[in-house]
Amino acid sequence: MQCEINEKKRVLFMLEKNKIVFVDGCRTPFLRSGTEYLNLMSYELGQFAIKGLLQKTGLDPNFVDQVIMGTVISNVKTSNVARESALASGIPNKVHCQTVTQACISANRAICNGINEIMV
Protein backbone atom coordinates (compact mmCIF):
# COMPACT_ATOMS: atom_id res chain seq x y z
CA MET A 1 0.00 0.00 0.00
CA GLN A 2 1.28 3.48 -0.86
CA CYS A 3 0.44 6.52 1.22
CA GLU A 4 0.61 10.08 0.07
CA ILE A 5 0.07 13.08 2.35
CA ASN A 6 -1.03 16.44 1.01
CA GLU A 7 -0.14 18.84 3.85
CA LYS A 8 -1.84 21.81 2.21
CA LYS A 9 -5.27 20.18 2.32
CA ARG A 10 -4.43 17.90 5.28
CA VAL A 11 -5.83 14.86 3.51
CA LEU A 12 -4.31 11.37 3.53
CA PHE A 13 -4.66 9.38 0.34
CA MET A 14 -4.15 5.63 0.55
CA LEU A 15 -3.62 4.23 -2.92
CA GLU A 16 -4.42 0.58 -3.61
CA LYS A 17 -6.96 -0.86 -6.03
CA ASN A 18 -9.38 1.94 -5.30
CA LYS A 19 -8.60 5.35 -3.92
CA ILE A 20 -9.55 5.71 -0.28
CA VAL A 21 -9.54 9.15 1.31
CA PHE A 22 -9.30 9.82 5.05
CA VAL A 23 -10.26 13.46 5.61
CA ASP A 24 -8.92 15.61 8.42
CA GLY A 25 -11.04 15.58 11.56
CA CYS A 26 -12.07 18.34 13.92
CA ARG A 27 -13.43 18.78 17.42
CA THR A 28 -15.17 21.25 19.66
CA PRO A 29 -13.09 23.07 22.29
CA PHE A 30 -12.79 21.73 25.83
CA LEU A 31 -14.93 23.56 28.38
CA ARG A 32 -15.86 22.89 31.96
CA SER A 33 -19.15 21.11 32.48
CA GLY A 34 -22.11 23.43 33.05
CA THR A 35 -20.56 26.50 31.37
CA GLU A 36 -20.90 27.88 27.81
CA TYR A 37 -22.27 24.65 26.31
CA LEU A 38 -24.91 24.25 29.02
CA ASN A 39 -27.88 25.14 26.79
CA LEU A 40 -26.71 23.25 23.69
CA MET A 41 -27.68 19.71 22.73
CA SER A 42 -24.91 17.25 21.87
CA TYR A 43 -25.94 17.11 18.22
CA GLU A 44 -25.68 20.91 17.95
CA LEU A 45 -22.04 20.79 19.03
CA GLY A 46 -21.44 17.93 16.60
CA GLN A 47 -23.13 19.91 13.85
CA PHE A 48 -20.69 22.80 14.39
CA ALA A 49 -17.76 20.37 14.11
CA ILE A 50 -19.06 18.70 10.93
CA LYS A 51 -19.96 21.99 9.23
CA GLY A 52 -16.54 23.36 10.17
CA LEU A 53 -14.83 20.30 8.69
CA LEU A 54 -16.84 20.50 5.47
CA GLN A 55 -16.08 24.19 5.14
CA LYS A 56 -12.37 23.76 5.95
CA THR A 57 -11.86 20.94 3.45
CA GLY A 58 -14.32 22.07 0.78
CA LEU A 59 -15.79 18.56 0.75
CA ASP A 60 -19.25 18.16 -0.76
CA PRO A 61 -21.54 16.47 1.82
CA ASN A 62 -22.75 14.12 -0.94
CA PHE A 63 -19.28 12.54 -1.09
CA VAL A 64 -19.26 11.56 2.58
CA ASP A 65 -19.39 7.76 3.01
CA GLN A 66 -19.53 7.58 6.79
CA VAL A 67 -19.56 9.78 9.90
CA ILE A 68 -17.87 8.56 13.08
CA MET A 69 -18.00 10.85 16.10
CA GLY A 70 -16.66 10.49 19.60
CA THR A 71 -18.45 11.78 22.68
CA VAL A 72 -17.49 11.71 26.34
CA ILE A 73 -20.94 11.36 27.88
CA SER A 74 -24.02 10.13 26.04
CA ASN A 75 -27.26 12.04 26.37
CA VAL A 76 -30.65 10.32 26.46
CA LYS A 77 -32.17 13.05 24.30
CA THR A 78 -29.52 12.53 21.60
CA SER A 79 -28.82 8.80 21.52
CA ASN A 80 -26.87 8.74 18.23
CA VAL A 81 -24.99 12.04 18.23
CA ALA A 82 -23.17 11.23 14.99
CA ARG A 83 -26.41 10.60 13.08
CA GLU A 84 -28.26 13.63 14.37
CA SER A 85 -25.23 15.90 13.92
CA ALA A 86 -24.69 14.64 10.38
CA LEU A 87 -28.31 15.22 9.38
CA ALA A 88 -28.32 18.69 10.98
CA SER A 89 -25.19 19.63 9.04
CA GLY A 90 -26.50 18.59 5.62
CA ILE A 91 -25.03 15.09 5.30
CA PRO A 92 -27.46 12.92 3.27
CA ASN A 93 -29.62 10.50 5.27
CA LYS A 94 -28.19 7.50 3.34
CA VAL A 95 -24.80 7.98 5.06
CA HIS A 96 -23.95 5.49 7.82
CA CYS A 97 -23.14 7.17 11.15
CA GLN A 98 -21.77 5.79 14.39
CA THR A 99 -21.18 7.36 17.79
CA VAL A 100 -18.32 6.26 20.02
CA THR A 101 -18.70 6.87 23.75
CA GLN A 102 -15.48 6.11 25.59
CA ALA A 103 -14.80 8.88 28.13
CA CYS A 104 -11.59 10.79 27.46
CA ILE A 105 -10.38 8.75 24.49
CA SER A 106 -13.55 8.71 22.38
CA ALA A 107 -11.93 10.80 19.63
CA ASN A 108 -8.99 8.39 19.40
CA ARG A 109 -11.38 5.43 19.31
CA ALA A 110 -13.44 7.13 16.56
CA ILE A 111 -10.26 7.59 14.49
CA CYS A 112 -9.30 3.93 15.01
CA ASN A 113 -12.81 2.82 14.01
CA GLY A 114 -12.53 4.93 10.86
CA ILE A 115 -9.17 3.39 9.97
CA ASN A 116 -10.60 -0.10 10.52
CA GLU A 117 -13.59 0.69 8.29
CA ILE A 118 -11.26 1.86 5.52
CA MET A 119 -8.96 -1.14 5.78
CA VAL A 120 -11.75 -3.76 5.66
Each PLM stretch: what is its role?
Residues 101-120:
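Active-site-proximal alpha-helical scaffold in enzymes
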